[in-house]
């Protein structure tokens, strides 16, 4: 397998403007000389996500690619793209915010972009510890996707998942170690209802984020 055209110092970050992907952004800036961002517009529940991602990219002076993935909303009804659908968890334990094949498609397009931009590294904020029932956030899926992308383009890509084995408290700890905890707390969008920063406090994403922050700050204060 040839990788002679890939820049080992260049990374593409799958970026939504949320806590996890913004932590990955700063992780990438620490570990790679050349960082670019890719955001997918798939008709997500809150349009503000694209605006937040664009603003953060500009503030960090990073090249930002926005790709149209609106076809995702046509595949299956889900609470991330259907604004009138209440967020619920099914009998199988998978919440209706799950978008089938989302990460499969996102990583495929991120890989195609990395190929065009000569980037060896792809960074995504998926996490198995707090994977919320999403099967495409599992480590086994990411490893298989890494092999598939490399074989499909005859390039030796490396998919990085710095948050894979971290819970939310540990993700906050990582952002603190990177010196950006306050920035991420006040400028990112995790809330399913589109409230920037600490969010609405009611949706599952906000509750998970706030619980993790509280646990981290309590542990930090005890040390």
UniProtKB/Swiss-Prot annotation:
It comes from the Bacteria. This is 7-cyano-7-deazaguanine synthase. Pfam families: QueC (PF06508). Belongs to the QueC family. Keywords: ATP-binding, Ligase, Metal-binding, Nucleotide-binding, Queuosine biosynthesis, Zinc. Binds 1 zinc ion per subunit. The keyword Methyltransferase does not apply. Zn(2+) binds at residues 191, 200, 203, 206. Its EC number is 6.3.4.20. The gene is queC. Its cofactor is Zn(2+). One of its GO terms (molecular function) is zinc ion binding. ATP binds at residues 15-25. Homodimer. InterPro entries: QueC, Rossmann-like_a/b/a_fold.
